[in-house]
C-alpha cells in the first residue's frame, strides 16, 4: 500500500481499517524468535548498544531490547495526520468495536478468516465497516507505520544515525539493506 492510496481514497482507507481491525491482533500475539532474544541479550551485556529495525511488529521490544529505533514505526500506535494526536491501537480497536457491532461475527459467518502476511484479514466486502476520525480534530487516523512513498520521520533517522555513529561494528540480521531508508544510515 502506498501513502497516496491511504490518504487519497476514503474507500481504500475504510477497506484497510476493516482488514486491519480483524487481523492486527495476530501480530500483537506474535512472540520473539531466537534472533530477537539474542540481540536483546547482546544489548543487556553491552555487546551492542541497541537495535535498529525496519519491522513494525514490536518483537524486539517484546524480546527486551531497550535502545530500539523502530525505523518504520509500529502497528501499536495510531496517529492523526492532521493534528498529530497519538493513541494506542488497542484504544482504536475498542472504538471500532463500538462503532461496528457484530462486524467480526458477520465476517466469521462467511467462513474462516484468512490472515495475510501483513497481518490484515483477507476481506472482499467491507462496505458496511465504519471508521472513526480523530477524536480531537476529526482528521484522518493512520497507523504509525511508514508506507511506500512516505519518508521516515527525521527524528527516527537521527536516532538510527546516532546509534550507528556510536558503534564500532554494525551487525545486520534479516535484511539486504536495499531499502532506501537504510542505505544512507
Where in this protein do the model-derived segments appear?
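Conserved catalytic core of sirtuin-type NAD+-dependent deacylases
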Residues: 1-184
Amino acid at each position: 500500500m502506498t501513502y497516496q492510496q491511504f490518504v487519497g481514497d476514503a474507500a481504500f482507507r475504510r477497506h484497510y481499517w476493516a482488514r486491519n481491525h480483524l487481523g492486527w491482533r495476530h501480530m500483537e500475539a506474535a512472540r520473539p524468535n531466537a534472533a530477537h532474544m539474542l540481540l536483546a541479550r547482546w544489548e543487556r551485556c553491552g555487546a551492542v548498544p541497541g537495535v535498529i529495525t525496519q519491522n513494525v511488529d514490536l518483537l524486539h521490544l517484546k524480546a527486551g531490547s531497550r535502545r530500539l529505533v523502530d525505523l518504520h514505526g509500529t502497528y501499536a500506535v495510531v496517529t492523526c495526520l492532521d493534528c498529530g494526536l497519538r493513541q494506542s491501537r488497542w484504544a482504536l480497536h475498542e472504538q471500532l468495536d463500538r462503532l461496528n457491532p457484530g462486524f467480526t461475527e458477520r465476517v466469521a459467518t462467511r467462513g474462516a478468516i484468512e490472515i495475510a502476511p501483513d497481518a490484515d484479514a483477507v476481506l472482499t466486502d467491507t462496505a458496511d465497516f465504519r471508521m472513526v476520525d480523530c477524536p480531537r480534530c476529526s482528521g484522518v487516523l493512520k497507523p504509525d507505520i511508514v508506507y511506500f512513498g512516505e519518508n521516515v520521520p527525521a527524528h527516527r533517522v537521527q536516532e538510527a544515525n546516532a546509534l550507528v555513529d556510536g558503534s564500532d561494528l554494525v551487525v545486520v540480521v534479516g535484511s539486504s539493506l536495499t531499502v532506501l531508508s537504510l542505505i544512507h544510515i
